[in-house]
Amino acid sequence: NSNEGTAKVFVVNLLDCSVMYTFGDNDEFSLRGSLSFFDGSALVDAETDTLIYPGENGILYLIRLNTKYDLNSGTLSIDPGRTVKWRYYGTRSSTESFWLGMEDSAAIYKGYIFMTDNGGNLMCLDLNTLQLVWVQDTLDDSNSTPVLEIEKGHLYLYVSTSFRLGWRSYDTATVPVWKIDAETGEIVWHTDYECTTDDGVSGGVQSTIACGKNSLADYIYVTVAKTSDNASGVLACLRKSDGSKAWEDSSSYAWSSPVCVYNKDGSGKVLYCNSTGDIRLLDGKTGKQEDVLSVSEGVIEASPAVYDNYAV
């Protein structure tokens, strides 16, 4: 929020940068009052032309956009129809801790949405019936976006959580990295890290896990913040099969999500940024440091976007 108005969602026309539609501000359907922040990224289902957006106000929005694009004139329009809203309340939800609301981005597979929330819940929701299929306890304020992976024909999720000061401890707390059966919500394995934290700068995992492909197909990569003290962290390479640690890269803590990049022969490297302004490039199999580029004296919270041979 600012002098310019209340936080909300903007639907922007990328052809002319005009604002086509806004929603989400001061929504009376929210159980979190006037809070209307949207930290995650939206998804649009092309087949149904539906915008799907979980918000920190504790509402999942489903909006039929009725998009029209005229190729000849180069014009784009939307005419949003009826908005469907879903909300929830957790068994430990309160205004002091374990808040309602989603700060992660949703993952969707065949009509099912997977999302974590501030209250330590990983939820699987049927988008056609808006009924919960299962809920798994993620212990703490969870901002890590669930990552879907099909392995031998079965769907799994990789996800983690953070450590918000005072909710579970004022000292240290366990932050697991989980592999979850996406059909049942059952925990397949977890690998635990003991983390510290600061008020407002949480330890644990704030990033999205990267699933390796090609030569890195056996591994996942996750940045874990504040593992030994408030300044330190690791990029962990874990085996998908059992969660065992293949290697770790220790540096300043990172909220940045790792990105796997590949050569034409399928060999892979891992790129991530940390809290002292470094961009680190590592061999994905061994963890050997390939290069470090210092671009800032401050924290890089953003994650690299990679296209061809360039990273932004």
Language model regions located:
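Short loop/turn segments that connect beta-strands within beta-propeller blades
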Residues: 13-16, 65-68, 126-130, 181-184, ...
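Active-site-adjacent structural elements in enzyme catalytic domains
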Residues: 1-16, 27-29, 38-73, 80, ...
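Short coil/turn segments that connect the beta-strands within blades of beta-propeller domains
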Residues: 47-49, 110-111, 153-155, 217-218, ...
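Loop/turn-rich, solvent-exposed surfaces of beta-rich toroidal or solenoidal domains
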Residues: 205-210, 219-236, 248-284
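Short glycine/acidic-enriched loop and turn motifs that connect beta-strands
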Residues: 2-6, 57-59, 120-121, 163-168, ...
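Extracytoplasmic beta-rich repeat domains
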Residues: 3-6, 21-44, 75-107, 134-151, ...
